[in-house]
Amino acid sequence: MRINPTTSDPEVSIREKKNLGRIAQIIGPVLDVAFPPGKMPNIYNALVVKGRDTLGQEINVTCEVQQLLGNNRVRAVAMSATEGLKRGMDVVDMGNPLSVPVGGATLGRIFNVLGEPVDNLGPVDTRTTSPIHKSAPAFIELDTKLSIFETGIKVVDLLAPYRRGGKIGLFGGAGVGKTVLIMELINNIAKAHGGVSVFGGVGERTREGNDLYMEMKESGVINEQNLAESKVALVYGQMNEPPGARMRVGLTALTMAEYFRDVNEQDVLLFIDNIFRFVQAGSEVSALLGRMPSAVGYQPTLSTEMGSLQERITSTKKGSITSIQAVYVPADDLTDPAPATTFAHLDATTVLSRGLAAKGIYPAVDPLDSTSTMLQPRIVGEEHYETAQQVKQTLQRYKELQDIIAILGLDELSEEDRLTVARARKIERFLSQPFFVAEVFTGSPGKYVGLAETIRGFKLILSGEFDSLPEQAFYLVGNIDEATAKATNLEMESKLKK
């Protein structure tokens, strides 16, 4: 961390640095730069190329040193387009790795990989910057306690709980509610934990990035009138950008999150959408640098690159970074090296189901496919574990019986199976929940449900306490008391209709 007096005026910085090189070769986004003997920059140092192209347009390209080639030459990868660059142009060694602005002033803003705001809201009101390349926290600094990160979302907290400072994989296709779930998590961490969030858009569509920004403004996650009240900082390196930018944008987002954890001592949520694109960009850069490809054409350093990012996402004694990473699985092949390497780092998986979304059950989290390493009696306690297992068993039995019901009907089932089906349908509906960020769509006020309330509700349903209540009473409510109140209202309405 350092206070950077030159962030507002890069020209001052360039005049101060006397370490000048010249472009010797350009191959797409890769530059070879020659420096005077004894003046070689370090690996990961930022290099800046300034000048004018043949049309007189100003050029300002930042690169990152990747290899020292010998003969006083380095090979660097550009973070933006290299059109207009020529051999012989001056290159300035900045003497440090890429540094990005950090702190409260980043909230409510959109940045690119270099930490430059791209939202037309003027410069960022901070002089504190931090380099994007750092070591992971030392083991002695880590908080090794296994504690649950309560989200206030029933289906997540009960069946696939998140670990504080853990990593969660989010699997889901288009239109099943991934964005709404992400926004609700951002909202809940701000309200319940006083925490903030950082969103890293890695190699995804520009349109999706813009849609997310607009939805965040609509739902109040970003407050345009008073940016200081915003709960999230956005960092985008979209799929039209060079591989260097897509490879480093995850580190830019992580660096901003680390400041909130280490200096502000907060709980932080870090979203990475999509972690596969980080690997894909690394693969492109590796090929451009001439490295021998590994399995399925991926970079030989795949595990190292993934590990250096994931090991920085952790809980320390000061605060925590809990990361939720969208995982694209190429051709649905879970053995592909990219997702397989990612799975090794995940503590929990949240799988969104199109079938549940089609039924109108939101959040459409699949209760049987979602998993968590935290769901063990010694971590969550016997009561939580037993309740979760009974819920899963009931839903699994219902799933097995669905074919029989479709062919023969409910009447052909045994008394015990009919009771199981009735309870499973209530559980399925009780796993739905009105979200704060979806109030404008549903017309229902959002609900945050504590873990103890969640467990109590499901225990009562499993015990048969509410067998007489209609299943509709359990749909889109918060805790179990709201379900009983809704049942009373439904009964009164039906009497009035008669």
Swiss-Prot record:
It is an enzyme of class 7 (translocase). It catalyses: ATP + H2O + 4 H(+)(in) = ADP + phosphate + 5 H(+)(out). It comes from the Eukaryota. It is found in: Plastid, Chloroplast thylakoid membrane. The modification Phosphoserine is found at S13. GO terms for biological process: proton motive force-driven mitochondrial ATP synthesis. Gene3D superfamilies: 2.40.10.170, Bovine Mitochondrial F1-atpase, Atp Synthase Beta Chain, Chain D, domain 3 (1.10.1140.10), P-loop containing nucleotide triphosphate hydrolases (3.40.50.300). It holds the Pfam family ATP-synt_VA_C. The keyword Nucleotide-binding applies. The keyword DNA repair does not apply. SUPFAM superfamilies: C-terminal domain of alpha and beta subunits of F1 ATP synthase, N-terminal domain of alpha and beta subunits of F1 ATP synthase, P-loop containing nucleoside triphosphate hydrolases. GO terms for cellular component: chloroplast thylakoid membrane; mitochondrion; proton-transporting ATP synthase complex. Keywords: ATP synthesis, ATP-binding, CF(1), Chloroplast, Hydrogen ion transport, Ion transport, Membrane, Nucleotide-binding, Phosphoprotein, Plastid, Thylakoid, Translocase, Transport. It is a peripheral membrane protein. F-type ATPases have 2 components, CF(1) - the catalytic core - and CF(0) - the membrane proton channel. CF(1) has five subunits: alpha(3), beta(3), gamma(1), delta(1), epsilon(1). CF(0) has four main subunits: a(1), b(1), b'(1) and c(9-12). PANTHER family: ATP SYNTHASE, ATP SYNTHASE SUBUNIT BETA, MITOCHONDRIAL. Belongs to the ATPase alpha/beta chains family. This is ATP synthase subunit beta, chloroplastic.
